[in-house]
Curated annotation (Swiss-Prot):
One of its GO terms (molecular function) is structural constituent of ribosome. This is Small ribosomal subunit protein bS16. Belongs to the bacterial ribosomal protein bS16 family. The keyword Coiled coil does not apply. The gene is rpsP. Keywords: Ribonucleoprotein, Ribosomal protein. It comes from Aquifex aeolicus (strain VF5).
Length: 112
């Protein structure tokens, strides 16, 4: 089961609001979600609320991020503060994953 952090639309007519949620990759946009990480208002371009500890928890579990969810969390500084030292963002197809960075010493040791 592939799990992703992505946006789920709700709100009213002509005023969409998106929840930043963790859900199965095959679920529809407004389908069942596993966890709510925050809320985003695109009209005002503000994060209404975000739970950085939940974002960090899911990122460390290896969850993929959709392009839009990654952009929103990165531009508002959430990903910068929750991603620990030694992790880097890698693009896997259309999605992003944080993985442990290999140290240069271990690479050099294998080559010698």
């Amino acid at each position: 089961m592939a799990v992703r952090i992505r946006l789920a639309k709700f709100g009213r007519k002509h005023h969409p609001i998106y929840r930043i949620v963790v859900m199965d990759a095959k679920s529809p946009r407004e389908g069942k979600y596993i966890d709510i990480l925050g809320t985003y208002d695109p009209k005002r371009k503000v994060l209404i609320n975000v739970y950085p500890e939940k974002v960090k928890e899911w990122v460390l579990k290896g969850v993929e991020l959709s392009h839009r969810a990654k952009a929103i969390l990165w531009n508002h500084g959430i990903l910068k503060e929750v991603v620990p030292e030694g992790y880097e963002m890698k693009r896997v197809g259309d999605y992003y994953v944080f993985e442990k960075r290999e140290s240069k010493k271990s690479k050099g040791g294998e080559a010698a």
